[in-house]
């Protein structure tokens, strides 16, 4: 079995944090996002991985080759962004082999080994309040998918596609995507993976819907921090600090410096960062960043950033009111 991971996204909604790195290279809980995805792939028993790269793809390639060289890796480059179906096609081969497809900017709460143990094709689904923003699966009483629709205006189901797919024979999916492109069948101007899977269903290929506990799309600051909380919760806390108060879960790099501060919960402090006289909760601090005399929550601090304020000495009497901007 092999895996295909689309990771060519620019991450416009995460700017300025994606001006210098691709979205999948943002640091969460002590590891780049693509690293967490590859850990999931390995837990499913995958040994061969195609990572579809684009924007600043050389950074992805360098990181993955450094830390995951034990896997068989290749990095197809998506020159033109023509949709998820087109991206996935770049990583498929003409071999009778199962393929696990995971979106490179998504964190999943699922048993991956159990997911790929299905005896048929499978897609991960999650119940959502507003399915119109997602690909949607309609299913029968046996959880067999009867229809897939990309971002329907009037959804007939509340089961959203979560961005994880297992196809028993990659050649079948490859043929479906190639037909979309040959016939120029687009939805919202792109070749959609959802439409290729629907073609498979229409051609008699069974696909099961597997409801998972949850998934975290890292496309916005808010969803990125949600993913961060989930990852810290499911990993052992790593603390390296003296003279500070730590509220787990946190990740503090062994080469970070934290002094006279309160850290956590849900904080990552990357290599070389220095935190002095600060209170941090729900925050990600990048490599070599400096934070001094600050109270931060729900914050993203980039690599080499400097965030500081001044200490103040005040003398405030009874019934007084002091407001500091």
What are these regions (language model features)?
Residues 10, 105-106:
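Active-site metal-binding loops of divalent metal-dependent hydrolases
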Residues 24, 72-74, 144, 206-208:
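Conserved beta-strand segments of alpha/beta enzyme cores
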Residues 25, 137-139, 209:
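A structural signal for short hydrophobic beta-strand segments in well-ordered beta-sheet cores
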Residues 50-54, 125, 284, 300:
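Short internal beta-strands
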Residues 108-180:
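Conserved core of the sugar-phosphate nucleotidyltransferase
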Residues 180-325:
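Left-handed beta-helix
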